[in-house]
Amino acid sequence: MLMLIEGSRLLNYPILSLHTATEIARVKALVVDPNYLKIVAFEVAAINSHKRLFLDVNSIREFSKVGIIIDSDEEFVEQGDIIKLNEIIALGFVLDHMKVVSKKKSLLGHVQDFTVVTDDFQIMQLIVKRPIYKALIDPELVIGRS
């Protein structure tokens, strides 16, 4: 099912196993590819593991209001397991509070949140909190993907 969801709502989102029909983890952080502005993985806090684990978005069976549904906890990978994913994690790219500037180099504000389409986890819109002097006219700016 295609849904638009705010990026902030993805944090602490439950991950459910199709095999056990129970919650096996929660989303801890988002791994965003800055080249495509797309979520490529989720860092997860697994219930039965203290390792730093990730869930590749290609392993997701279904995204629903109940949670992210995957086959089992065998879908979780460690940081060094997938080379491409490891390179993106090493970048440490985080959208929250990132400065947004125009082509003319004027400050538009800072990223407050963003919306994601759940079929391929593309970031579709940035929700920008405006600086105080611009917030009087327009407190929030929504920038769509073009």
Question: Over which residues does each language-model region extend?
Answer:
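Peripheral interaction segments used for macromolecular assembly
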Residues: 1-146
